[in-house]
Amino acid sequence: MSKVIFALVLVVVLVACINATYVEFEEAYAPVDCKGQCTTPCEPLTACKEKCAESCETSADKKTCRRNCKKADCEPQDKVCDACRMKCHKACRAANCASECPKHEHKSDTCRACMKTNCK
C-alpha cells in the first residue's frame, strides 16, 4: 500500500514540475505586445480619432471630414504614439530577430515573418 501512495505522490510531483516548466517556457517566448505597451501614450490619439468620428457624423462626406480632422487635430498625438511603437519594435527586433533582420533588410520576407511572430 505504501508503494502505491509513494508512486502517486511521485506522479503528482512530476506533473507539477512539468506544468511549472511549461508555464515558464510559454512566458519566456510570448510575443512582445508593442500595441499593448503603448496604450498610455496612444490614449490621446485614440480619443482624438473618436472625437473626429463623432464630429463628422453630420457631415455629407464623412471620409473626407474624418481625414481632415485627424490631419489637423490628431497629428501631434500621432507622433508620440508612433515614436512609442517604433521604439518598442526596434527593441523587439534587436532582441528576437537580429539574425533574420540585418541592418538594412527590414523588408525581407524572413524578417517580416519573424517580426509578425515575435513583435505584435
Curated annotation (Swiss-Prot):
Q: Which residues form the signal peptide?
A: 1-20
Q: What is the effect of changing residue 104 to A?
A: Loss of Co(2+) and Zn(2+) binding and reduced Cu(2+) binding
GO cellular component: a single term: cytoplasm
- The reply to whether Repressor figures as a keyword in the UniProt entry is no
Instruction: State the UniProt keywords alphabetically.
Output: Cytoplasm, Disulfide bond, Metal-binding, Oxidoreductase, Signal
Intrachain disulfide bonds = 34-88, 38-84, 42-81, 48-74, 52-69, 56-65, 92-119, 97-114, 101-111
What Pfam families does the annotation carry?
Vanabin-2
The molecular function GO annotations come to: metal ion binding; oxidoreductase activity
Q: Where in the cell is it found?
A: Cytoplasm
Name the principal localization, coarsely classed: cytoplasm
Could you say what the effect of mutating residue 116 to A is?
A: Reduced VO(2+) binding
Subunit notes for this chain? Answer: Interacts with VIP1.
Q: What is this protein called?
A: Vanadium-binding protein 2
* Gene encoding the protein: VANABIN2
